Amino acid sequence: MLKALVAKGPGGRVIVMDSISQATPKDAGAIVVSGSHGGTSSGEIALGVPFKVVVFNDAGVGKDDAGVAALEMLQARGVAAGTVAHTSARIGDARDAWENGILSRCNAAARNLGLETGAILREALSALIDP
């Protein structure tokens, strides 16, 4: 599984990881693009590392918004989070999300940083690290 630093600037660093389960304490403060779905199990893992921003795949959203449930969990802790549309990036493929992802959902903390639904993920995150 891929885990790589793909961008770095005065505002931080962007790490892509195919699974959020690859996160470690060394990733604290990073902007993380994960290939994982944005469900509650992914949210629980993401809460264990203090990310600046974390992005998941919306996995088609699913019943009762299960594919994006992590966004509310993370918002409750003040963590900026979003999802890319499953139609824009393959689930489980963080590099594809970084290169082709379109934001489908953003929590309030992410919107406060300037992330918006419909934005090209790479451009939006690049603006955060190199304002």
Language model regions located:
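Residues that scaffold, gate, or flank divalent-cation-dependent active/transport sites
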Residues: M1-P131
